[in-house]
Amino acid sequence: MRKKTDLHSHGTSEKQIEGFVQVRGAREHNLKDVHLDIPRNALVVFTGISGSGKSSLAFGTLYAEAQRRYLESVSPYARRLFHQMSVPEVDSIEGLPPAIALQQQRGAPTTRSSVGSITTLSNSLRMLYSRAGNYPKGQDILYAESFSPNTPEGACPTCHGLGRVYEVTEQSMVPDDSKTIRERAIAAWPPAWHGQNLRDILTTLGYDIDIPWRDLPKKDRKWILFTEEQPVVPVYAGFTLDEVRHALKRKETPSYQGTFTSARKYVLDTFANTESPAMKKRVSQYMVGKECTLCQGKRLRPESLAVTFAGYDITELSRLPLKHLATLLHPYAQENTPDWDKLAAKNPEKAIVTQRIAEDLSNRLSVLLSLGLGYLTLERSTPTLSPGELQRLRLATQVHSNLFGVVYVLDEPSAGLHPADTQALLAALDRLKQAGNSLFVVEHALGVIRHADWIVDVGPEAGEHGGRILYSGPPQGLSEVAESHTRRYLFPDKEADIFAKQPSRSPQGWLQVAGVTRNNLDNLTAAFPLGVLTSVSGVSGSGKSSLVSQVLVELVSKALGQELVAEAEQGESIEHDTPATLGGRITAGMESIKRLVTVDQKPIGRTPRSNLATYTGLFDHVRKLFASTRAAKARHYDAGRFSFNVAKGRCGNCEGEGFVMVELLFLPSVYAPCPVCKGTRFNAKTLEI
């Protein structure tokens, strides 16, 4: 590691940087016994290529140790309620203040979480309506909880605060009415034996399951799909209608007694009661949502929606863009509305409450606007936000909190942010620093790196070839570190222009779309060149993701006849989904497209056992290779024997994890290598191959 550059030579005085966080012997992940001094009360940016060890140092070491020390001051009982990070591999850290982490991660798992809830602006807005709203004559005052769709007091009794009601229809359950019941015309019924059982029961009940669905009498179709009756009848498995009639006449012994369940009842009961995500996902495709007729999609009780402020009910106000909401509230915060004097004279208490809540909302909204988030609405659901938007929302909350003496650890706050908005982000970071806080930022954006007071460059390469501190000091000093990849971009050599223009390719065709309508896109027409790399740009919130990640994917998928399966976030289910209308059409270019592959930012692994080799299928070949050896064949070992997810080959002590958890009461759990397999994850017999 290069020694710290002389502070005076780069315009940063010792007076500006007061004290250091001293890290000694950091060995978390790929860090190689790192010794480092990091200044406090400064903007410190951790740089280096992906996988070099930046996050291991900033989050895995500094933040994890700060959290551990903080939790030591919390009562043992309360400590158990926190999600505690593992104890970092480090000899010592001195001079470390309390830390708050703002990481690149998804928000709450359901769409009931919104911009308003994670910024707590919705709480203030509900208080504003409760204490300062205009009530209809004779209506009693409502508490703030009555303006939340997530509480029994406020949720619409019909849709339970969802804004939509879900039902099943004949068209959704029977997509092809030319099929017979025996040919599985009722797609909503279960597959395999259970579905065959229901078809056999219909035969016993006297229904002909061998004529097209459309030819059945309407009364029969309605009973089969929607009845709540559950008759128990004898079942003659595999018999035709005539054979069943003869068997009943002769009083033959049936195969068994079966209970009939209509298609609607099966779908709704399965969705409500099953614990299988796969079963829930299957039946959800037969459910159709529509806007709740009682609340008109506003999710609240009628008495809550009857209360207004500035002519809006609370849902209408929550649907305004934040910049419009700030404009609406500003006159109330300044006591400058046309009827303010009248309000103050008639109801001074209400005037005071209105002014104070409006002022608080205005101040908090101004921070969001300065971070370029004015296009969002309070009602915007969390899962639809990008990781960068989520992190900037959390950053705005911290800017408004006015904490002092805290370390903020941020993970690429510029991610997804247009360069035009970067200056606003830097201004917010400066406000936190000027308030007496320290900022440790993991970042790749050159604009943020250049703005840093101090740079910690980690590398030189990724993985085992990284984990060393190449440089720690003011930004200008990095220009002297030859092995730094960051230096090449921060201080590019004129002789070797890394930004030299590459030869461009000519389009081999054009994919043209028209009438695109989604979110803020209104009847848009666009053309995408084929056979080339295309970048879709625009400021944050301009509609890039709506166009490319949503509409374009859906239109191409539909044109190819592919089933577009959007993986729900953990905890998501159909009752939280509001289907978006497929707005737009492809006018030309589909003849050149044979396949659609969507690559997004969602985690690829579903379980902790998932790794790069298992996800890509590489490990399948490795297992087959071991199974093909002479020793494995002699022992009759198949490929499954060499999987740490299968009991016959994995270590029985750690169940293929490679480590065991040692649970310590009131302390973070400690993970240690398995004493039986020594971390290899397999049993001794398997390892002999």
UniProtKB/Swiss-Prot annotation:
Single Gene Ontology BP annotation: DNA repair
Lineage: Bacteria, Pseudomonadati, Pseudomonadota, Betaproteobacteria, Burkholderiales
Coiled-coil region: none
GO cellular component term of the entry, any: cytoplasm
PANTHER family, per the entry: UVRA PROTEIN, UVRABC SYSTEM PROTEIN A
Protein name: UvrABC system protein A
Keyword annotations from UniProtKB, A to Z: ATP-binding, Cytoplasm, DNA damage, DNA excision, DNA repair, DNA-binding, Excision nuclease, Metal-binding, Nucleotide-binding, Repeat, SOS response, Zinc, Zinc-finger
InterPro entries, sorted: ABC_transporter-like_CS (IPR017871), P-loop_NTPase (IPR027417), UvrA_DNA-bd (IPR041552)
